[in-house]
A protein has these predicted regions:
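A short, well-structured alpha-helix characteristic of acyl/acetyltransferase catalytic modules
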Residues: 25-29
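A short, surface-exposed loop/turn module that caps and links secondary-structure elements
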Residues: 32-57
């Protein structure tokens, strides 16, 4: 059973403003990751986050997606996304 992908309100607002081909690419990457969440070469742990609430980042071309994995509820919660050059983790 795979994980379910959810967006925060802010991430959802950013996501809908992206061009359609970028949205499709991000959706595919998140869906692939949700099937096997702990084995993906373009995912790294974000440094500086509290140990009880770790965040991860995924590289999708020139875009970055930051998310949390909520294991007890099988949810991948997308916190933020955007282009690499103006993205804050």
């Amino acid at each position: 059973m795979g994980y379910r992908v959810q967006f925060t309100h802010r991430a959802e607002k950013t996501f809908v403003t992206l061009p359609q081909h970028i949205r499709i690419r991000i959706e595919k990457a998140l869906n692939n990751f949700s099937q096997v969440p702990f084995y993906h070469q373009d995912v790294k742990k974000v440094r500086g986050c509290p140990p009880d609430k770790p965040r991860y980042r995924m590289r999708i071309g020139e875009y970055r997606v930051t998310f949390r994995i909520i294991q007890n509820r099988l949810i991948i919660c997308v916190v933020a996304l955007g282009k690499k050059e103006n993205f804050e983790y």
